[in-house]
Amino acid sequence: MEALSINAPTQASTLPSGLQISKEVEKRYNVVRSVGEQCIHDDELKDLLAKKAAPVCYDGFEPSGRMHIAQGLMKIMNVNKLTSAGCRVKIWIADWFAYMNNKLGGDLKKIRVVGEYFKEIFQAAGMNSENVEFLWSSDEINAKGDEYWPLVMDIACRNSLAQIKRCMPIMGLSENEELSAAHILYVCMQCADTFFLEADICQLGMDQQTVNLLARDYCDVVKRENKPVILSHHMLPGLQQGQKKMSKSDPSSAIFMEDEEAEVNVKIKKAYCPPDIVEGNPCLEYVKHIILPWFSEFTVERDEKYGGNRTFKSFEDITTDYESGQLHPKDLKDALSKALNKILQPVRDHFKTNSRAKNLLKQVKGYKVTRVIPTASSTKEEDLSINTSASSSAAGLQMSEEAEMKYKIVRSIGEECIQEDELKNLLAKKPAPICYDGFEPSGRMHIAQGVMKVTNVNKLTSAGCQVKIWIADWFAQLNNKLGGDLERIRVVGEYFKEIWQAGGMNNDKVEFLWASDEINGKGSKYWPLVMDIARRNNLRRILRCGQIMGRSETEVLSAAQILYPCMQCADIFLLEADICQLGMDQRKVNMLAREYCADIKRKNKPIILSHHMLPGLQQGQEKMSKSDPSSAIFMEDEEADVNEKISKAYCPPKTVEGNPCLEYVKYIVLPRFNEFKVESEKNGGNKTFNSFEDIVADYETGELHPEDLKKALMKALNITLQPVRDHFKTNERAKNLLEQVKAFRVTR
């Protein structure tokens, strides 16, 4: 490749900022600017080059099959121009992105082979490797996951789903196509790459412009002063009429970097090249964007009777002759074939003489090009009916009395169990199954989170289970709890732990795990799992999981709310959970985990044990809400607060259905005390109930009056909460945590 000529102005120029630009900077600017069909913005590029001797330029590719000349020759020319102008070029080998986009069937080993093959071509074809770094996305992200993933999540939080969908052209898709959740994650990650690589310039194709603009918009949102300059290069069309770009899946549309001379000749011969027409003519495009920049001239050899040989120095001269008919399509094609073959010969030689390159090419040629995402939406959702059989065996396994007893304890936690036979089988075979529970630290703790969790965890540990409680701090951030402030979220998590300790949780066999710490520590295992779940589930399926965040699929969602279910599903496998013990509102994502097992043919599916959701205190409130204090009793509420809230609670006489006071007796008081004492002098005297059925019978007949029910409920709740109050009054750490939490504003 010949030296690059620089057409520089003879005098220095001045930027709008008032900065004087030297002739040297003008020269560098002209070289760098020549790379892009479009620059956003020219003044910023000049300013950057004037202030920074070695700006960082980000380029990249998905390793996805054989390399065509648009990827090969144009990238080589662009990189060589950039390094000649003093830039440091970071070439991002986007293996994880190819995986999410299901290139090569999502086979990371094959993707790695293709990446190495690309590097061999760049070397053989003349890329100047000085000031060029090839970086594998998986390696770099794994090495600095604690820096990268919070950035991805922040971008996801700050952009609506609609904004992200507008970036689908970067993957050759439209926002109206059937998308997978991975396509949403892909955009957020590519946007993050710009900042992760500390790029001053994004040098990618015009088809990547939407995500580069997203990065600039993100700078505005986070008030980052230095935005990346976008330098978008031209997209070479395919060889046939109407093909906007070369396609690996259609070999006739593209010339590959190791094509033999005869193959190049045949492809160019068959290429679309209408006489006298320049617009939409791929042969002329290749001359303009490859041959002229490479050789600085284009030589046409022909008989004297057709005008003789001619060497063109500018594209304008070529188009003038072509439009007038002086340059015939056949002569153009012959000259183009000859020039391309001259450029490609060193690559052919390298792949014939270098054994490593030869082996790589052989493997790559054997790979099938794929694009279809293997979504789990085609997998039939399993039957959700509950097996209520009281059989003492599961899958033909005879259960011991001890296993039967364990089963009854564990099963009593769940309003629903999917599936009971699987639970019996698990308890019969595994002495200490792992149970996954968790919470978003998002404000004060109400009794549904406090008392019910203590009761459930103590039951599980008494039955031999190991309980892993997932403190979902990153999830609270994704859901914009406490304004997404991780320091505040951390404070709330510590406050929750204090309450459970004071409330009587047996910490033997219980682990509290911070999501951010665990994910950062095991990122190389966790994030590929998230990506695989995302690529196997279409967007509609993930949207149906919005309920786990208290959202509906019709709401205006951020991209974070697509990432959240994929991550929560991955948590189950990261924690190696046998049982998912969460509320009924989390059921859809737990089902997603079981569907994923079916999709990847994993035999042991997590058992779903979904506990009841306590309603709010007022009529029609499906669950307690921290944002409405009148709907909830908090774990450190004073006795007077509890009494006032219960006295105002909805409690219609003789009506059991939708009666929150009776719900609290059933799910909090009876499991805690194994009895419910009602004291009443005027309404039949004192009575102790040992079953909820007896309470219901008396309430429906009117023998148990709402006023007496409420008084007994107040007393039982206050007995339960008193140790927590005492702890938060006497323990300085707990007292300080509570003061902070009470001051935090609840946000959504």
From Swiss-Prot:
ATP binds at K626. GO terms for cellular component: cytosol. Disruption phenotype: No visible phenotype under normal growth conditions. Disulfide bonds: none annotated. It is found in: Cytoplasm, Cytosol. The modification N-acetylmethionine is found at M1. Its main location: cytoplasm. GO terms for molecular function: ATP binding; tyrosine-tRNA ligase activity. Its EC number is 6.1.1.1. InterPro entries: aa-tRNA-synth_Ic, Rossmann-like_a/b/a_fold, Tyr-tRNA_synthase. The keyword Iron does not apply. SUPFAM superfamilies: Nucleotidylyl transferase (SSF52374). A motif ('HIGH' region) lies at residues 441-449. Coiled coil: none annotated. It catalyses: tRNA(Tyr) + L-tyrosine + ATP = L-tyrosyl-tRNA(Tyr) + AMP + diphosphate + H(+). L-tyrosine binds at Y564, Q568, D571, Q586. Pfam families: tRNA-synt_1b. It is an enzyme of class 6 (ligase). A motif ('KMSKS' region) lies at residues 623-627. Keywords: Acetylation, Aminoacyl-tRNA synthetase, ATP-binding, Cytoplasm, Ligase, Nucleotide-binding, Protein biosynthesis. NCBIfam families: PRK08560.1. Belongs to the class-I aminoacyl-tRNA synthetase family. Catalyzes the attachment of tyrosine to tRNA(Tyr) in a two-step reaction: tyrosine is first activated by ATP to form Tyr-AMP and then transferred to the acceptor end of tRNA(Tyr). This is Tyrosine--tRNA ligase 2, cytoplasmic.
